[in-house]
């Protein structure tokens, strides 16, 4: 009887389980790595992303050029924003300046989304990689894009690194709240699929 009860409890537990869809990043600062490198790993828990390696070549644009924004997850056209005069070469999640941006999604309440926003988390990553040289510049670029054009995704934690520094930046809901924290020199950090920053300034 005890075995049967245990089996029934286990079956109930398993029947309520959801499959995991959890991106995970590991961030290692130059002071914590053996050779002084910044390292960011990115495990996107999605069967459709295995082997993806996106390429955006460096380019020059005339004054007044516009960039089309397409929602990263759905492929839906969202709108246009002004393009900058020069963009950097991007392969995967790293640009020619060794700036890396990865993400983990922790979601949020459905009513916190901004249907008027033009920038989703994927567009934010790749536009920023094309426009920024350093982690600090990336944080500034991301904040400006969200402030100017609105943020349409849920809660996201971005792992941002250049050869000298490692940062975690988080955006929540409508893009009204955002925060960034510098990872100290000799640290290894796991950035799971959850909000890590608790106080936003």
What spans do the regions from the language model cover?
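Second-shell loop/turn segments in exported
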Residues: 113-115, 123-132
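Sec-dependent N-terminal signal peptides
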Residues: 4-13
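Sec/Tat signal peptide C-region and signal peptidase I cleavage site
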Residues: 16-22
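A contiguous strand-loop segment
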Residues: 23-121, 141-201
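Single-residue recognition of alpha-helix boundary sites
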Residues: 13-14, 109
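Positively charged n-region of N-terminal signal peptides that target proteins for export
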Residues: 1-4, 18
């Amino acid at each position: 009887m005890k075995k049967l009860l245990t089996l029934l409890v286990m079956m109930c537990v398993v029947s309520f389980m959801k499959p995991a869809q959890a991106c995970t990043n590991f961030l290692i600062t130059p002071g914590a790595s053996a050779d002084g490198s910044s390292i960011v790993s990115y495990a996107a828990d999605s069967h459709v992303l295995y082997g993806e390696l996106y390429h955006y070549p460096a380019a020059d644009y005339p004054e007044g050029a516009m960039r089309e924004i397409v929602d990263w997850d759905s492929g839906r056209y969202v709108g246009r924003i002004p393009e900058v005069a020069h963009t950097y070469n991007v392969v995967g999640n790293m640009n020619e300046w060794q700036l890396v941006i990865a993400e983990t999604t922790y979601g949020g309440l459905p009513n916190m989304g901004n249907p008027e926003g033009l920038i989703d988390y994927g567009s934010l990553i790749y536009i920023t990689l094309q426009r920024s040289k350093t982690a600090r510049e990336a944080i500034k670029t991301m904040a400006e894009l969200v402030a100017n054009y609105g943020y349409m995704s849920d809660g996201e934690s971005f792992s941002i690194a250049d050869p000298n520094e490692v940062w975690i930046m988080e955006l929540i809901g409508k893009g009204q709240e955002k925060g960034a924290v510098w990872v100290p020199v000799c640290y290894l950090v796991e950035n799971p699929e959850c909000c890590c920053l608790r106080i936003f300034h």
